[in-house]
Amino acid sequence: MSLTINHQTNDISNSTGTITINGVAVGGDNTPIIWSGNRGLFGGGDTGSASNVIDYVTIATTGNATDFGDLTVARHSPAACSDGIYGLFGGGFIPADPTGSATNVIDYVTIATLANATDFGDLTVAQYGPAACSNGTYGLFGGGLDGSAINVINYVTIATTGNATDFGDLTAARYGLAACSNGTYGLFGGGWGGSNSNIIDYVTISTTGNATDFGDLTAARRFLASCSDVTYGIFGGGNTGSNSNIIDYVTISTTGNATDFGDLTVVKYGPAACSDLTYGIFGGGSTSNVIDYVTIATPANATDFGDLTVARTSPAACSGD
């Protein structure tokens, strides 16, 4: 069996899991796995009040974000993932008198088309501050707060609107965590479950079941963000007791503790992150409009990318084409 990518034919007859050919992740069924793309979207957040703003950037080109459209309901602390075509924004917190509430709303957009979001379906439970990742087919939403921290993982088929289904449980209940994937494994790191957590869990995205311990972040923290390429997952920002500019990384296919990657340009509580599988961008956080970027395969400090259209804390981000 062979597969041609970028005009190069490659023998993959003996491949299992995810392999990489010319920067493209390829699954065991010999098809490209796409969970990201060139356009990065940032949706929702807290500007002092809840925001419904979605803005976008071209990840390979530094510059300020442009308006994309609006979420169906203004909220902060949702989570987002994509299949490279559709972007989903699920969960979050809708402030309202007197205390507000977590939500189970899932919205979707077609990433290539500027427009307002449309209702997709509902999570199995309301989730404030969940994290999300994808393998290009299934989108997982894990953790969150619904009165108390929860360990629930839900999943949806991204290309098919409908309500989420139970996937399994995280190893520890927490919210304000972050997630990424390499197209096969999904990692959920950090969060708050009564104290800051350094836990990294992992799941095989195509197989329902409970998460397994992966290792530890370099610093326990909450409301951080994560993105990845096909090899490395990076976790940036968050609150360790004070707001942080920490970036650490792991090799997603190899369990173990995270290693220092570098620093964001500014401390960020509640940023959001996405990637084009080469560059990772971290936008917003600490009611800032700053977007930073890194080259995911090269540990180093982040560089200024540009600005969001609206400064805000705890948006969610995904990417596609």
What are these regions (language model features)?
Residues 2-4, 10-321:
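Polar, enzyme-active/binding microenvironments
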